[in-house]
């Protein structure tokens, strides 16, 4: 039995009526999903950058990038061409409304010593996924995200904090080594690969959050 499956079983045994995020399971799943999908995510980002100037298409691909964790949570390897699927453009209006409904309150909350803004950001971090995957309207999606993350916000915060710190430390070490070698092309390739893996694991963390919490709200 794979380690991630064992961790999932342990996490499930600890769950009661409300599913909660497991620190260990999140990182185990994120590494497994992220490393496996790193090349595909590079392809997604490259295609997104190449088409960001194309009106209408760019909205769909931007939505697709934000929705990648949903596909990653299914456990397979994603296709970079999937960001052009018309289903993403179908949700353009709801996506923009949801974004607007979240940005202003988070900004206002951040004025109160930043912490409330962080709490709201985490509480609403699954809103897009509920909007797209469970067909909620914008207000329902935000409310569902808040309900689904109840009891898990601190764990999610420390997962994200640990990831950011680890990413900065690892990037710093690689940058120092590359600077010592003083080989421009090698530095470029290494740092590009590192950025790709970091981006991939970041999306995979959100995928794990979604996988663990999505059933808290029907």
Language-model regions, residue ranges each:
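Selective recognition of hydrophobic, aromatic-rich stretches within alpha-helical transmembrane segments
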Residues: 48-78, 106-143, 182-217
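Alpha-helical transmembrane segments and their immediate interhelical/interface regions
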Residues: 14-21, 28, 71-74
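Polybasic, lysine-rich low-complexity intrinsically disordered segments
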Residues: 3-4, 55
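Gram-positive cell-envelope targeting signals
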Residues: 1-2, 9, 22, 160
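Interfacial aromatic "cap" segments that immediately flank transmembrane helices
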Residues: 20-50, 81-108, 120-173, 204-207, ...
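Short, contiguous pre-domain boundary segments
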Residues: 4-18
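Juxtamembrane "helix-exit" motif on the non-cytosolic side of transmembrane helices
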Residues: 173-181
